[in-house]
Amino acid sequence: MGGQIRIPDGIVFLNGIPVVVLEFKSAVKENTTIMDAYTQLTVRYRRDIPELFKYNAFLVISDGANNKYGSFFAPYDFFYAWRKIEADDKELDGISSLVTMVSGLFRKERLLAVLKDFIYFPDSSDRDTKIVCRYPQYFAATKLFENIKKHLKPEGDGKGGTYFGATGCGKSYTMLFLTRMLMKSPYFHSPTILLITDRTDLDDQLSKQFIASKKYIGDETVVSIDSREALRQELQGRTSGGVYLTTIQKFTEDLELLTDRTNVICISDEAHRSQINLDQKVKVTEDGVERKYGFAKYLHDSLPNATYVGFTGTPVDGTIEVFGPVVDSYTMTESVKDGITVNLVYDGRAAKVTLDQAKVKEIEDYYAQCAVEGANEHQIEESQKAVAHIDAIIGDPDRLRAVAEDFIRHYETRVSEGATVAGKAMFVCSNRKIAYDFYQIVVGLRPEWAEKKICPDGVELSDKEKKELKPIEKIKLI
């Protein structure tokens, strides 16, 4: 176009179709970088030879020492290295990462697998959205797929395996890739897949993503379940297919058998919390002994022949017992090195605790009474150790206010210095009540943080941005 010749450095053809375009720069030239290669592909070539990219799968930019790939529509920050040849290999950098990319990503059968199952387009989008898997997502999905086949009931034990992925590493896309592989595989005979979370906000996030991916998944029945009865109606009588998203709390003791089919796969997000409580709990009440099980017990009773897969950023013993051993992992160290998540740096900011003297006397009187009633010194000592961490101390109003004031000062200083990632911060409390009390104190000190806005004050937006952006508050309690 325009009478000018453009010659890309490399093109990978598949049956005559240009599926990958590569651009190379020299590592020894100080005035050129792979950022220049990115600009050349996504700006100049996009403008001058757009027909070349009609069937493009992804781009590669390289100077020999720095080697990255990514979607034609992706910003430069979303181009990543492929740092392994095989899943259990050690990650490699520098010139070695060129070998891992060529041997790991461009091996014939693997490139075909990536083209087939690991490039995602949403069903509809008002912008150019295309997601190409990263190497940890590819290895996690493929290893879980094979492990599910191995442990599928009735021949297997129904423990499809555990995936340990660092927080923020893209587990939801790994679930999406795995779901497509399961639905497209003749081996599973069009399985029914349940995606289960333990919080409504996680359920909403996954539901939005999966419902917008029906064509990619290969099943028009992708449904967010909002009640036990709706789940029963959807699953009973169904012989195959369907993707259902729900929360573990939908599974209570009044939920009867849903199906005894073996081609049912349950994928659990945050599989270290309420999704592993299979044991019976006994509680003595005024009316007698009360026996209860956790939500996970009722889930497994409702779907006795299902195969269970767990995704977690915090694997515990209970996770392994319910879902099986860790099949693949992607650690925080690896994620930071790949530029997926930011590094965590400890900055000690201990808050002094001063208790109301009335509370101190109340506690002392309690232990004196325990001794009178026959508690031995060991029992009293153990209880005193425990009370040092009770919520009455941690959630003391004076302490919470001091912590909130320090947090606000620290946060605002870091933002002004440009030391945060887009002004983001996360505050973790020991329980919901303390979190709520802390939230109320912060909002009282900074009421404007609770106001819903589409952007910070003073930031100018285009008309398009004003239409697309939705107002949100600066601080949110979850």
Question: Where in this protein do the model-derived segments appear?
Answer:
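ATP-dependent helicase/translocase motor core
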Residues: 1-197, 201-217, 239, 243, ...
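Conserved structural-core and active-site-/substrate-pathway-adjacent residues in large, well-folded domains
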Residues: 22-23, 59-63, 137, 168, ...
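Conserved helicase motor
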Residues: 200, 222-232, 247-253, 430-432, ...
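Conserved motor-coupling elements within RecA-like helicase/translocase cores
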Residues: 226-244, 257-261, 470
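Conserved helicase motor "Helicase C" RecA-like lobe of SF1/SF2 P-loop NTPases
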Residues: 432-477
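Signature of the SF2 helicase/ATPase Hel1-core->accessory helical subdomain module
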Residues: 34, 80, 252-253, 259-381
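Conserved nucleotide-binding/hydrolysis micro-motifs of P-loop NTPases
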Residues: 19, 26-29, 65-68, 200-202, ...
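Interdomain helical connector at the RecA1-RecA2 junction of SF1/SF2 helicase-like NTPases
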Residues: 92, 320-422, 438-444, 450-455
